[in-house]
Amino acid sequence: MKYTLEGSNARVIAKAVQSLSKVGKEMFIEIDQQSLQMRAINATQSAVGSISFKRSMFEVYDMPPHSDFYCKISMKGCLAVFRNMNEVEYCELNLLDNQTNLQVNLRCKLETTKEATISIIDDQNINTNINTDQMPNIIRGDHKLLTDISNNFNSSEEELTLEANSGSVVAKNYIEGARVNDKFMRTQLKLKPSEFEQYQVTKETVITFCIKEFRAFLLFAECLNASLTLEFDEAGMPFLLKIKKHGEIECLLIMSTLSPDDISFSEDYCQKDLTVQDEDVRAAAAKRKSSVSKPNVTNKRKGSSSEPAAVQPKRRVEETQLESSLDNPLFQFRDSEAPSVQHPRILAEVDTVVLIEDEAEQEALMLAAADAALEASMAPAPEPPNSTEVCFINTDDSQQPKPAKSSSDEDETIPQSPERPNKVLGVLLGLLQGCVSRLKTMLRLDEHLISGYELL
């Protein structure tokens, strides 16, 4: 099989290879009795590009009757061959070695020839089952207009959104209500139907598609100086881009659009939707209220004047039932208290304490005595008169007998005892005697009270 083209048509094929290289990394070639088709599919299988060249473009189109051929080759190898085509005057394509290699011969100016061989990876082809002739919305415009629309957005943009209705079409780089970065710059461009060659939008639609493949086919349309046709239906349905030139070259780009279920909306936008839904629910509830209350109004008019007072509470009950059905919370709490909480006890008159005046005076006296004892314990204890204490520290292990004390000291000092509790008791008795003597002078109490306290 042999196919030859002149230089200008060979440069068109080179442009087609460059455009398809931006879609996928592999090229699928299909040759039949009518045309030669080149296809490419992206890695995510969301876009398929196809460019068809009719048989009339070739000078020699040697194809066996009732036969076809298809294969898959590397896109990188095609780009290396179809490069710098300005000097090419003639191009020849041949299938060699039992259709396992594709040979490309390029004859350039000054009688120079380039020859390259591209190996065939597999005899594989791709097809689509999408009906490309029944789309409700069709927009056709010059390639310059669509190129200007594309140039208004940054080259780093990945998606383009079109909002089309009967009055205008808006192209923007964002989705209304979707989550975006705070530093993201939003851009939109609004066009009138008069700026297009054909504007047929019968169904208001908002679609989002990938802009990378769209720009790749815009470059090929600029090379052909041809118009582009956009055909689409609704979000989630395929988006078609078609290019035709003199009935010899046909291009078709099929891209998937973003479904509304795959969009991550922001919380504010979701809140707006919820408020709108709440308003719709409330409006429906109001309609139901009016439909329920109408029979009551007619009954009131037919009855006597005393009936409205009896019917009015029924209407309020019905309204509260409707509102409670709409505003019914997920959780219901009871007004009962927890069983572990005890009620506060109220003291009765029997539980109250009544103090007698004499007992109150005695209690005050005891408290004053305790305070005085505490102060005396904090202050340094006075030494008894005419007494001398001498402390001896025995460093020897042997115990020596203690000297006997004189009888005169027994009345003035408290005898020492080896038992510590008796010593502490003696100190406390001495402190109490000192407190009593002080209370006699300060408080000037009666003699019978003081004598009773000494007896204690």
From Swiss-Prot:
Q: Where is this motif: Nuclear localization signal?
A: 300-302
Instruction: Alphabetically list the UniProt keywords.
Output: Nucleus
Q: Among its keywords, does the record have Nucleus?
A: yes
For this protein, the record's SUPFAM superfamilies field holds:
DNA clamp (SSF55979)
Coiled coil regions, renumbered to chain? none
Per its UniProt record, what Pfam families does this chain match? Rad9 (PF04139)
GO CC term (a single one): nuclear membrane
The superkingdom of the source organism is: Eukaryota
Q: Which tissues is this chain's protein expressed in?
A: Expressed in ovary.
BP GO terms, sorted: cellular response to ionizing radiation; DNA repair; DNA replication checkpoint signaling; mitotic intra-S DNA damage checkpoint signaling
Under the heading InterPro entries, the entry gives:
DNA_clamp_sf, Rad9, Rad9/Ddc1
Subunit structure of this chain's protein: Component of the 9-1-1 checkpoint clamp complex consisting of Rad9 isoform A, Rad1 and Hus1-like; the interaction with Hus1-like is direct. Does not interact directly with Rad1; this interaction is probably mediated by Hus1-like. This complex probably also forms with Rad9 isoform B, however 9-1-1 complex containing Rad9 isoform A localizes to the nuclear periphery. Interacts with Brca2.
Protein task: Component of the Rad9-Rad1-Hus1 (9-1-1) checkpoint clamp complex.
Give the family, as the similarity comment puts it.
Belongs to the rad9 family.
Write the protein's name. Cell cycle checkpoint control protein Rad9
UniProt organism field = Drosophila melanogaster (Fruit fly)
- The protein's gene is named Rad9
